[in-house]
Design a protein with these regions (language model features):
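Alpha-helix-loop-beta-strand connector modules within alpha/beta enzyme cores
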Residues: 60-82, 115-127, 187-198, 282-284
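Hydrophobic faces of well-ordered beta-strands that scaffold small-molecule active sites
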Residues: 23-29, 54-56, 78-82, 100-102, ...
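Glycine-rich, proline-tolerant flexible connector loops at the mouths of alpha/beta enzymes
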Residues: 30, 35-36, 47-70, 101-109, ...
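Catalytic alpha/beta core domains of metabolic enzymes, predominantly
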Residues: 132, 140-287
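Hydrophobic or amphipathic alpha-helical targeting/insertion segments
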Residues: 87-128
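Active-site mouth loops of central-metabolism enzymes
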Residues: 20-38, 57, 76-84, 140-153, ...
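Glycine-rich phosphate-binding active-site loops on the catalytic face of alpha/beta enzymes
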Residues: 96-110, 202, 225-239, 317-330
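N-terminal amphipathic alpha-helix/helix-capping segment at the start of soluble metabolic enzymes
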Residues: 1-27, 121, 284
């Protein structure tokens, strides 16, 4: 079993990260933060599927002011994402942000950074120091002859030291790159240099397919070394998909229990049902159930029962009929049209099993 990189404990609103606390799943809204109704609606949807920390862009004073009302209507910690204008960071904290994300390098002078730190210190609000490979300082690019993991880490640690020298260490660090292996190496390096909690993600990962693959490889390699306290799957698309992917990778790595895992066969010439459609329907349906079980969806009654042995429950389709399989044994036969309702019934009564 992997040995976890133990970091300092940091409180973000009603949630603790770091230490031995579970790795928290984070996402970011894609609504206009000023649109309180739309932003709250999206946060509630994300919370329902398992988002545990939410970040909102704060590009204007109007967006900062909207945080007050947003906070009243949500139940998970709210992080304000700030770029360039230190006054927005201060306003976001005054309007209830549980954490702020800044890059001290683009906030401005040392005095402006200190103004932000002073308010954070007064309110005990954690600061996430974020550094991306795309915004690496020219001096570090020249020093390392290009954008490198070493340069990213040095940039982040310089900014952390800047804030620590101001007498504040309630920090979270984020170092990101769209280059997967560079991002992995950077996390390996920084984990040896700091005990501040680390937020892990692959930035600009891409659309659903490419983004999931890149994020799964990158986050998988990082998390499997015990590194990481919060994670985000950055996908170009519906943020709800980010949460599904994040939950799955944590479960796959054995870092989190709970949630129904669906396994399904890849189909072959023996398949006699619309297995692709059925598997997708099952995956959508099981997300409603707070169970810690494995569900198998198989395409034929020949190999289905054997292949579903490792699952807690499964279904296997045939011509006009199908099987319900429980704990590797055929439980009952049902008409094909009743496979999905029969599975739902079994899941609804699983606690009675």
């Amino acid at each position: 079993m992997m040995e976890r990189h133990i970091t300092k404990e940091v409180q973000i609103g009603n949630r603790w990260i770091g230490g031995n606390h579970p790795i928290a799943i984070q996402s970011m809204t894609n609504t206009k933060t000023e649109d309180v109704a739309a932003t709250v609606a999206q946060i509630k949807q994300l919370t329902k599927v398992g988002c545990e920390i939410i970040r909102c862009a704060v590009p204007t004073q109007e967006a900062a002011a909207a945080l007050t009302e947003i906070k009243k209507q949500i139940t998970i910690p709210l992080v304000a994402d700030i770029h360039f204008d230190y006054r927005l960071a201060i306003a976001a904290m005054e309007h209830g942000a549980d954490k702020i994300r800044i890059n001290p390098g683009n906030i401005g002078s040392r005095e402006r950074v200190k103004a932000v730190v002073d308010v954070a210190k007064e309110r005990r609000i954690p600061i996430r120091v974020g550094v991306n490979s795309g915004s690496l300082e020219k001096g570090l690019v020249e020093k390392y002859h290009g954008v490198t993991a070493e340069g990213i880490v040095e940039s982040a640690m310089d900014k952390v030291k800047l804030i620590e020298d101001m007498g504040y260490d309630n920090l979270v660090i984020s170092i990101k790159s769209s280059d997967v292996m560079m991002c992995v190496k950077a996390h390996e390096l920084i984990a040896k240099q700091t005990d501040h909690p680390l937020h892990v993600g692959i930035t600009e990962a891409g659309t659903l397919i490419s983004g999931n693959i890149k994020s799964a490889i990158g986050l998988g390699l990082i998390l499997n070394q015990g590194i990481g306290d919060t994670i985000r799957f950055s996908l170009t698309g519906d943020p709800l998909e980010e949460i599904k992917s994040a939950k799955l990778i944590l479960r796959t790595l054995g870092l989190r229990k709970g949630g129904v895992e669906v396994v399904s066969c890849p189909t072959c010439g023996r398949t006699r049902i619309d297995l692709i459609g059925l598997a997708n329907q099952v995956e959508t349906m099981v997300s409603e159930f707070p169970l810690d079980i494995k569900v198998a969806v198989m395409g034929c009654v020949v190999n289905g029962p054997g292949e579903a042995k490792e699952a807690d429950i499964g279904i296997a389709g045939g011509v006009g009929e199908g099987l319900i399989i429980k704990h590797g044994e055929i439980y009952k036969k049902v008409p094909e049209a009743e496979l999905l309702p029969a599975l739902r019934y079994e899941l609804e009564h699983w606690s009675e099993d």
